[in-house]
Each structure stands twice: as structure tokens, then as C-alpha cells.
Amino acid sequence: MIKPWLFEFLPELGSPSVEPNAQDVAALFGRYLDLWVRDEALGFEGIFFSEHHFGRSYSPSPNLLIAALGPRTKRLRLGVMGVVLPYYHPARVVEEIGMLDHLTGGRLEIGTAIGVPQELGRLNMTMAEARERNDEIVAFLDAALTNRIVSHRGKYFSFSNLRLLPRTLQQRFPPRWMTVISAESARRAARRRVRISTGFNATQLIKRIFDAYRAEADALGFEAGLSTSRCGGALPWRPQQAKRVCMRTRSPNA
């Protein structure tokens, strides 16, 4: 069954060489929040927000978008695809997951990502270091979501007997996702028993990624469940035409 989700980039106004009016930026956030509320009425399953830094996007901290949108919606699943783990301290990641799950009434989805080279490089972080940090934080995240008290000793972080609050509202924890761009990363996701998201690649590569994921999940006896492929699209500018397109997307048999 196809369940339509939205993937939001929240592009910046104007161009990098021209600073936009602050009131226009404030109005942009308000307009997007109103649109996302309307997406719930159109029947979308949920929204994933992207995380990007240093230009092109107004979404450097998408958890704040979830906190703002959660009280204004009732049914939409909300998450980040994905939280760029190499930027963060793992304890803070876990604590914010707990808070957001309560602020959304148990509608949070947990998505993680390694990040993109261009943005990581601005902080003098190589992809090799980013992968190491990501793997270490992912291991801690999985442990912290399932244990009341957690300790960790790794290359980048070490601490003992942390009690991270609040615990998530969803039991055992919210659905977990991982962004993947290769068959091997898809297999790693299956071994963690998490869902995957990929996209913006050739159809044959995407097929290989999902085939590898399902094969690994089957071998482990893990029910793969929901997974997503992200793609771009355009809607007619006339409201009624756009609504008809959205309603057809909502129901594949329409």
C-alpha cells in the first residue's frame, strides 16, 4: 500500500548575494506552517524535514519545526530525514527525541543521516570522520532508547550511568529510519532493524538498494515494513488542479 509523505527542504528566499527582508523570512515560516497543517486535511501520512546548513535552506534545526507544527496537527507523523548525527552530542539527540515524541503526542519518527560532504567540509570534518561519528552515535542511540541507564565508551564520546529524560511516549520507542545511498548501507539498516529512505538516484540503483534491504531483512527474520523513496515533483499553480493531483496521490485507485 502506498502512503504519501512529504519531504520538505524549506529553501531560502532570494539569492546568496542578497539578504532577504527579515519580515519576509518570518512570513515564509508562517506560510509553510499553514500549508503543512492543510496537508493533514489532504490525507498525507506524514512529513519529513531535511537538515541543511550554511545556505540554500532555512532548516538548520528541523526539530524546531516539529515542535512548532506538532500542537497544530492531530494525525500527521513528523520526523527529520535525517538528523545529521556527526554535528551533535549523542545525549542531546536522545533527550530531544524524548521531548518531541511527547510534544507531538506520540507521532515522532526518528530519522538519522551522515550528512553531505559540502556542508561537513565547512566545519573541517571529513566524510571518514563523519561516518565514524555517525556509527558511534547510532550505537549509543539504539542503546539509550532501550535502556533506562546508559553508559558509553568510544573514540569521540565517553560517559557513564546517564539517565536521559524524558523517555519516549511511544513504546518501545518511535519508528527509526536511516538514509541510505548504497546496497551495503541498506543491509546495515536491516541489521539494525530500522526503516530506510533513499532517493534522487537512478531507478535501477534504487531498486538494488531496496532489494538488498529486503533480502537482508528476510534472512534475519525481520519484517521490513515501511520504506520510502524521495523524489521531486511539481504541482499546477491553480488551487483546484493542485488539489485534484494531491487527492489522486492520496488514493492510488482514484
Describe the function of each predicted region:
Residues 1-73, 77-78, 174:
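N-terminal beta1-alpha1-beta2 module of alpha/beta enzyme domains
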Residues 2, 6-10, 128-164, 204-254:
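An alpha-helical appendage that flanks or caps ligand/catalytic pockets
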Residues 2-27, 86-152, 195-198, 202-204, ...:
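Flexible, glycine-rich active-site loops centered on histidine and acidic residues
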Residues 4-8, 47-49, 78-81, 108-112, ...:
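Hydrophobic faces of well-ordered beta-strands that scaffold small-molecule active sites
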Residues 13-29, 83-91, 168-180, 235-238:
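Active-site mouth loops of central-metabolism enzymes
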Residues 37-41, 66-75, 97-108, 190-191, ...:
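Acidic (Asp/Glu)-rich catalytic clusters
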Residues 43, 51, 69, 100, ...:
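Conserved, mostly hydrophobic/aromatic
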Residues 181-186, 190-202:
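A conserved active-site cap/scaffold subdomain adjacent to cofactor or substrate pockets
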